[in-house]
């Protein structure tokens, strides 16, 4: 899941392990995971804008040796000038004056910055430091001009040439470089002595100690990418030269000699940090299909002097996500509470007892889930605001750290780490924000299944395949447009209570349990309603009569019971009395 870094992307941070000879952020602790360096990978990805590639292949910027020269105080009476020169791997110009001349001096593409000096920069006798100062040359060099795009560089390209001013005879004005060898490694390894001789004075053109900053100007215009040079310069060690230019007399004519010697080389290492990585191997870029393929490539984070330029380097970064088509064997549901609600209510409808309490409990669960999502959304929104504030507050603190103390260098490295970390965190938070805004199926946690229905007529499989490869040139597959469609579908689900269909089924079931509906179904006419009223009155009457009869029977039983109780009480008290009295008593 990687996507190429293109010329339209912002420059990334490339860290070197030596700040005295190479400007920019430094870090000698890379790679972070040495055991994972060189992992094999096969890639087949697409692109929209031209990708950034380094190496000897179509669509890639080719390497070349570049020199940077400074003057030092003269130490010999026969020397016109004394030099210190640094040679290292850089980016090769591809000059075509007839086709590329309009680009080379066009003010439209000229960057803002200080012009390069008119004189060679002065330096002390100490060769242990090199002060870099960014400047803009009088004309640009063409690094690439083909079907992949036009890439230029406004950094100075210093080299020796003949000074023909004031010369009456024919003077060869062609530029000559002390490193013109076709074999790059041979020019930096085997040739440790350079000598240039001529009857004309030697001059150094394109003064200035500045690093290349290539940028694309066609078919689109993008930002400068100074980090690419830090990758190429670390692919081979840099060589330090010392020498001078002497003036002699030959055949009664002045004779000029530039003599340079080298006995010092410095190995370098350049690294990128996640989410960026380097794909190294036989990379093939196909502009017709806008795809990049590489089989049996290696995935690296660092480049050092052991790199072989028979391979190519492709800058890639981890992809935030991809939209794919899926099919489900069940209805799409937004949360587990909806699923539980549906399953529970199926059983509850068959058993009406405790239905209201269960319904209240489930609804309270839905409210709790909704409240949790709302709180999470607020927290995420606050986090995004904090990241934007940090991004606005954070400034580009990359300077010429080689002229600062060691503690300033450490602070600079921490700031660079913070900046790249903040950018990475910002991308992750934006991805999380989109994730929270989407309505996803509850039964998948590693990825999000949205309720958006796939329309084959609008997005046929070729478009989907291009999207999976990373190509976004088709407007119908533009990610932002697709997200808007999915957000609209999600909002449609958010406008309704989750589980609306299940709750609607419950409402229908409750309506069927209502006796009033039965009466309405049976008694839809006045006669039936009247008969029902008479039946009700008859039943009421019958109940009243039964109640009265029961009360009378109860009164008779009470009197009989009282009489029997009185007779039982007087049975023994009448013995010895006269028969008359007994009769009277009985009569009473």
Curated annotation (Swiss-Prot):
Retroviral envelope proteins mediate receptor recognition and membrane fusion during early infection. Endogenous envelope proteins may have kept, lost or modified their original function during evolution. PANTHER family: ENDOGENOUS RETROVIRUS GROUP K MEMBER 113 ENV POLYPROTEIN-RELATED (PTHR34313:SF3). The chain crosses the membrane at residues 522-542. This is Endogenous retrovirus group K member 24 Env polyprotein. The surface (SU) and transmembrane (TM) proteins form a heterodimer. SU and TM are attached by noncovalent interactions or by a labile interchain disulfide bond. Specific enzymatic cleavages in vivo yield the mature SU and TM proteins. It comes from the Eukaryota. The record marks 354-355 as: Cleavage. One of its GO terms (molecular function) is structural molecule activity. It holds the Pfam family HERV-K_env_2. It comes from Homo sapiens (Human). Keywords: Cell membrane, Cleavage on pair of basic residues, Disulfide bond, ERV, Membrane, Transmembrane, Transmembrane helix, Transposable element, Viral envelope protein, Virion. Belongs to the beta type-B retroviral envelope protein family. HERV class-II K(HML-2) env subfamily. Residues 355-375 are annotated as: Fusion peptide. GO terms for cellular component: plasma membrane. Expressed in teratocarcinoma cell line. This envelope protein is encoded by a human specific provirus. Has a type 1 genome. The HERV-K(HML-2) family contains type 1 and type 2 genomes depending on the absence or presence of 292 nucleotides at the 5'-end of the env gene resulting in Env proteins of distinct sizes. Despite their overall retroviral envelope structure HERV-K(HML-2) type 1 envelope proteins lack a predictable signal sequence. Subgenomic RNA transcripts coding for full-length envelope proteins have been detected for both type of genomes.
């Amino acid at each position: 899941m990687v996507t190429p870094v293109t010329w339209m992307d912002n420059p990334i941070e490339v860290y070197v392990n030596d700040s005295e000879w190479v400007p920019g952020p430094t870090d000698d602790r890379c790679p972070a995971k040495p055991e994972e360096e060189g992992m094999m990978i096969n890639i087949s990805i697409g692109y929209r804008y031209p990708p950034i590639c380094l190496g000897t292949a179509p669509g890639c910027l080719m390497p070349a040796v570049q020199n940077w020269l400074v003057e030092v105080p003269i130490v010999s009476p026969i020397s016109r000038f004394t030099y210190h020169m640094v040679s290292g791997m850089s980016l090769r110009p591809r000059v075509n004056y007839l086709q590329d001349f309009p680009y080379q001096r066009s003010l439209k593409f000229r960057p803002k910055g200080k012009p390069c000096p008119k004189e060679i920069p002065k330096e002390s006798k100490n060769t242990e430091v090199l002060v870099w100062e960014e400047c803009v040359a009088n004309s640009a060099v063409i690094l690439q001009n083909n079907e992949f795009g036009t890439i230029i560089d406004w950094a100075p390209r210093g080299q020796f040439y003949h000074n023909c001013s004031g010369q009456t005879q024919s003077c060869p004005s062609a530029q000559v470089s002390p490193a013109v060898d076709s074999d790059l490694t041979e020019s930096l390894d085997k040739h440790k002595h350079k000598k240039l001789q001529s009857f004309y004075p030697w001059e150094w053109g394109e003064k200035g100690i500045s690093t290349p900053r290539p940028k694309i100007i066609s078919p689109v215009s993008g930002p400068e990418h100074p980090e690419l040079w830090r990758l190429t310069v670390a692919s081979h060690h840099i060589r330090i030269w010392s020498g001078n230019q002497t003036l002699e007399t030959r055949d009664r004519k002045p004779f000029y000699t530039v003599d340079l010697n080298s006995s010092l080389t410095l190995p370098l290492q350049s690294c990128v940090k996640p989410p960026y990585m380097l794909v190294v191997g036989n990379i093939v870029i196909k502009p017709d299909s806008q795809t990049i393929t590489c089989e049996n490539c290696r995935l690296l984070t660092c480049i050092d002097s052991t790199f072989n330029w028979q391979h190519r380097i492709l800058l890639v970064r981890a992809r935030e996500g991809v939209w794919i088509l899926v099919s489900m064997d069940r209805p799409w549901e937004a949360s587990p509470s909806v699923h539980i609600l549906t399953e529970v209510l199926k059983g509850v409808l068959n058993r009406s007892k405790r239905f209201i309490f269960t319904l209240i409990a489930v609804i309270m669960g839905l409210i709790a889930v909704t409240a949790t999502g709302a709180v999470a959304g607020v927290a995420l929104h606050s986090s995004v605001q904090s990241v934007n504030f940090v991004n606005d507050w954070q400034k580009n603190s990359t300077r010429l750290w080689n002229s600062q103390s060691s503690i300033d260098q450490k602070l600079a490295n921490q700031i660079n780490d913070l900046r790249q970390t903040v950018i990475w965190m910002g991308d992750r938070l934006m991805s999380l924000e989109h994730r929270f805004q989407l309505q996803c199926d509850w039964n998948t946690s590693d990825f999000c299944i949205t309720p958006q229905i796939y329309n084959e007529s609008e997005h046929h499989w070729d478009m989907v395949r291009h999207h999976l490869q990373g190509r976004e040139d088709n407007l119908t597959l533009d990610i932002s447009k697709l997200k808007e469609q999915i957000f609209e579908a999600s909002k449609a689900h958010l406008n309704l209570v989750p589980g609306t269909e299940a709750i609607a089924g419950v409402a229908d079931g409750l309506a069927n349990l209502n006796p009033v509906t039965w009466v309405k179904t049976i008694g839809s006419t006045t006669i039936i309603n009247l008969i029902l009223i008479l039946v009700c009155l008859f039943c009421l009457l019958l109940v009243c009569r039964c109640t009265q009869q029961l009360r009378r029977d109860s009164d008779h039983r009470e009197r009989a019971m009282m009489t029997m109780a009185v007779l039982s009480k007087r049975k023994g008290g009448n013995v010895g009395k006269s028969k008359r009295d007994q009769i009277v008593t009985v009569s009473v």
